[in-house]
Amino acid sequence: MIVKMKKVLLLTLSKYKKESLEILRDFGAVHINSCNKNSDSLKKSIDDRRILMQAFSLLKEDGGVKALKSSNGNFLDIAKSIVNLGNEIKEFQDIKRSLLHERNLISVWGNFSLENIDELKESNIYIQFFKIQKSEYKNLLRDPNVNVLLIKNVKNTSYFVSVGEFEQKIEIADEFKFNFDLDYINNKLKVVDEILDQKLTQISLFNKYIDILRDEIKNYDQIVEFEQVLADMQTDXEDFSYITGFVPAESQESLKNAVLKAGFAAQFADPEENDIIPTYIKRKGIANLAAPIFNILETIPGYKERDISFIFMLFFFVFFGMIIGDAAYGVIFFLIGILLSLSFLLKGKPLTPFHGLIFYLSVSSILYGAMTGTWFGSPLILEMFPILNSFKVSYLTEKNSVQNIIFICFSIGVLQISLAHVWNFFRQVKEKPHIHSIAQIGWLMCIVGLYYLVLNLILSQSRFPMYNVVYNVIYFGVALVFVFGKQDGSNFFKCILKSFGGIIEQFLTTVSGFADIISYIRLFAVGLAGLSISASFNTMSIPLLKSSNIGLIVAGIIVILFGHVLNIMLSLLSVIVHGVRLNMLEFSNHLGQEWSGCAYRPFKKMKK
């Protein structure tokens, strides 16, 4: 349910604005309209939080070090020390990387002393280092004016030195000049490694502060939020400051009483058309299980749109079962849910909607898999446990089962899409002009007619023979949409003329409705693909498992485990791609849902 909101303006004396915001934050229900203004204290808070986050990112969970839960130390100074150490470590790591690169360049020519080369140079013996294409080196050997010595060939490159009484210029080769030799670099690397070890040891001693810094970052998140709201407060004639926002209508009286006690004023009003109103959704029961899904997708309905959580979860239950399609996978999900729940309960943490979602979807997969007799995609399971056969539904497993499942897919599609238009009808019939809602009756007629047409074209023309009445239902439905779809309360016939301007759009929308029904066949197709994958890996592993060779048996176990883990991962991905899509695209399009909302984020103090 989307909660009704009220617009609120809060006015206080400028000298008391900090105290007023503290009271407002303690109340914890007002969504503040942010202006993203700046202030010195806000900048400082953001900079301090950035230092804390940098320090936290440099620390590691260390099982050998007991993490401190509290400390009287200055956390910011500790964080700065960690960041400085981190910068020093990065600096030495860069030096090490540069030295290793230099060593790789020199090592091709072998170990030599630059001092010896300089001494030879003083005696007019010049040694130079070059590299060249292997084919070009052979040509270079034919030049009588060049005295060269091959050091090494690496792939298609020749590394060589030239020796002479003067410096030579070999234009077809690349010359290398070195500042250090291998001995110097190796000694330098040794020193750098020792310093790095010391620095890494020093920073590891700070790992005990990881929990404290994590809590301090959360604390600074609230400080930054408070400073941002403080900066956003607008001043009127220097004596008064005010801020605007939104509050749930159910909290209006409570807020009014709270601000009166605090000594500042509040003015309430209904939101206007152009206001960006936050969407506050209250969910209960099954609908609450949708929260983790919408949080992951980051989709929020607009304030004037509808909360589809309950319907979403009803149909998602069916979609999940048909896409996963394996009862054994459902049992695995159920066991994972139990383990996750126990881990939370043992730590004293409350269970979340996510835990309920796992159990809810597990049951879906178990039910559908049991009805189709699918357990790890293998008939051997049914042979080993004959009782499982009693759960099979003949409509889904015997003759014409494929056609029956496809029929179910299309029926689910027409049910969900029709539900969207029924919902639209009941909403529009309460609004003016009431006749606009008749277009939804037209849509219902179209969808039902198109549904029968889909059954005729895809399933069976003999089982679903086409009658003229079906075409007439579609035509009449399109006519109703055409006549009443653009009615806005002005002249009836002028609104019909507006429909002529969108006649192509109307045609495409009707075709889209046909395609939307067909798209529900993905429930069958994706489920069948998952069954085929599991069956294929089962077939591959059986000869290996029947072998008397232990190595082959182990290989068979690996094959079957890999196959089913892969299939579970692909099936879960399919649930997101296809199961969520049917709710968020096909259903939402027919409902007119644009998911254009912004989240309700009340200004409140977070519990530690």
From Swiss-Prot:
GO terms under cellular component: plasma membrane; proton-transporting V-type ATPase, V0 domain; vacuolar proton-transporting V-type ATPase complex
One term of GO molecular function: ATPase binding
Keyword flag Transmembrane helix: yes
The protein's name: V-type ATP synthase subunit I
Coiled-coil segments: none
Domain of life of the organism encoding this protein: Bacteria
Family named by the database record: Belongs to the V-ATPase 116 kDa subunit family.
Described purpose of this protein according to its UniProt entry: Produces ATP from ADP in the presence of a proton gradient across the membrane.
Signal peptide: none
Any GO BP annotation: vacuolar acidification
Membrane-related topology note: Multi-pass membrane protein
Keywords: Cell membrane, Hydrogen ion transport, Ion transport, Membrane, Transmembrane, Transmembrane helix, Transport
Major location category of this protein: membrane
Cited InterPro entries: V-ATPase_116kDa_su
